[in-house]
């Protein structure tokens, strides 16, 4: 880490150098903003190296006086972090009041924050999904609800994995993320977490995601994990419910919008996953050799095809050989909204003849996770039938118009 003081035109600016490449230099200024300059246009007044601060873990803490206990499992991510503008480090928030302050959460609930991981979500692997799931299962014996604080980038993967691994749930499980850290005035972390706690205090018997319903404050949606997807890089309402309305909304109280699975008297957690599954985005120019290399040694592959679920005809023989060897090829659509239909055009019919399984209107990432779950849990000869079975609400009978979904009607 380097701290610098530089002159740009008539201004003197100090801060931390966070990137320097391709003739550009990016500085995290003392006011917290990132500023990028053409290297040739700045003059360094001072530049010195400093030891990078350690990445700290959030501390375990329990607060509140409420009768119902909610366990918050911290895995990393923006939701429970703040930026130290003096050092440039991202540090965890260890005091729940920084997230829950200004609400009555701690008078109605007892909140126990427990760290189980401290990773950016893009670094999480299927083994980490199992670890998170086991922690949720352990907490289910004592808590009335479990909230998992998670980075948003891969939250849909992890939450969907838990949705499949939990055959029965004794308490609600709600994932929560944030697009902006808690130190920023525009942070969504506090509202998302407060809503998540309230969602976790219901009789929900499935895995949900708690995120802003719009760019404005005041409304937070609870999305069914297996119908959710991050659809924007930075907006506070980055997550969308694909093809169905949100499960519920929170605007000071919880209101369920559609039918949902209720909690059970017992917990059944089945953690075995087969991670030899791949996901491939078809694109013009993808050749047979590259496709063969991508799917080699994989037990299943989810292909994101064009439109109704197509790929170039010269790749179909590769897929046919792959399925003939006892593996599974699943066709999803790059369009996200709508459903695959391989019976409309000749290419689709050739893919069906090659042994391809349609994902229908499953979200592609969910199809990927479901394949891992089925291969890890059931005899492989059941895979085709089970994949087409609606197990956790991952398949919908019909897609609703986007306008209706946004309105939650």
Swiss-Prot record:
GO terms for biological process: amino acid metabolic process; regulation of translational fidelity; translation. Pfam families: Asparaginase (PF00710), Asparaginase_C (PF17763). Its EC number is 6.3.5.-. InterPro entries: AsnA_fam, Asp/glu_Ase-like_sf, Asparaginase/glutaminase-like, Asparaginase/glutaminase_AS1, Asparaginase/glutaminase_AS2, Asparaginase_C, GatD, GatD_N_sf. Keywords: ATP-binding, Ligase, Nucleotide-binding, Protein biosynthesis. Residues 68-390 form the Asparaginase/glutaminase domain. It catalyses: L-glutamyl-tRNA(Gln) + L-glutamine + ATP + H2O = L-glutaminyl-tRNA(Gln) + L-glutamate + ADP + phosphate + H(+). It comes from the Archaea. Heterodimer of GatD and GatE. Belongs to the asparaginase 1 family. GatD subfamily. This is Glutamyl-tRNA(Gln) amidotransferase subunit D. It comes from Thermoplasma acidophilum (strain ATCC 25905 / DSM 1728 / JCM 9062 / NBRC 15155 / AMRC-C165).
């Amino acid at each position: 880490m380097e701290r610098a003081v530089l002159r740009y035109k008539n201004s003197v600016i100090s801060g931390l150098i966070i990137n320097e490449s391709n003739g550009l230099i990016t500085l995290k200024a003392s006011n917290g903003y990132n500023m990028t300059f053409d290297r040739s246009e700045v003059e360094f007044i001072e530049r010195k190296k400093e030891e990078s601060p350690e990445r700290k873990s959030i501390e375990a803490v329990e607060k509140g006086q409420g009768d119902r206990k909610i366990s918050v499992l911290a895995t990393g991510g923006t939701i429970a972090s703040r930026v130290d503008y003096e050092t440039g480090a991202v540090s965890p928030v260890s005091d729940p009041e920084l997230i829950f302050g200004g609400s009555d959460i701690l008078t109605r609930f007892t909140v126990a924050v427990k760290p189980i991981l401290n990773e950016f979500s893009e670094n999480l692997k299927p083994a980490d999904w199992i670890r998170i799931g086991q922690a949720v299962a352990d907490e289910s014996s004592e808590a009335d609800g479990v909230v998992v604080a998670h980075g948003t980038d891969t939250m849909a993967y992890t939450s969907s994995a838990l949705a499949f691994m939990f055959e029965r749930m004794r308490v609600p499980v709600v994932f929560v993320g944030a697009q902006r850290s808690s130190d920023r005035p525009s942070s969504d972390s506090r509202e998302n977490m407060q809503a998540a706690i309230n969602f976790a205090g219901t009789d929900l018997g499935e895995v949900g995601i708690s995120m802003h319903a719009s760019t404005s404050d005041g409304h937070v949606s609870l999305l069914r994990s297996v119908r959710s997807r991050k659809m924007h890089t930075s907006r506070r309402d980055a997550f969308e419910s694909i093809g169905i309305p949100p499960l519920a909304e929170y605007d000071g109280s919880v209101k369920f919008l559609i039918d949902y699975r209720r909690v059970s008297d017992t917990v059944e957690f089945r953690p075995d996953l087969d991670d030899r599954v791949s996901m491939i985005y078809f694109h013009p120019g993808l050749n047979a050799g590259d496709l063969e290399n991508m799917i080699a040694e994989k037990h299943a592959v989810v292909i994101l095809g064009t439109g109704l679920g197509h790929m170039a005809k010269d790749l179909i023989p590769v897929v046919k050989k792959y399925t003939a060897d006892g593996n599974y090829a699943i066709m999803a659509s790059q369009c996200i909204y709508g459903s695959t239909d391989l019976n409309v055009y000749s290419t689709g019919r050739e893919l069906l003849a090659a042994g391809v399984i349609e994902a229908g209107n499953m979200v592609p990432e969910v199809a990927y996770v479901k394949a891992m779950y089925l291969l890890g849990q059931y005899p492989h000869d059941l895979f085709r039938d089970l994949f087409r079975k609606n197990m956790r609400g991952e398949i919908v009978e019909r897609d609703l118009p986007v306008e209706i979904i946004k309105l939650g009607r």
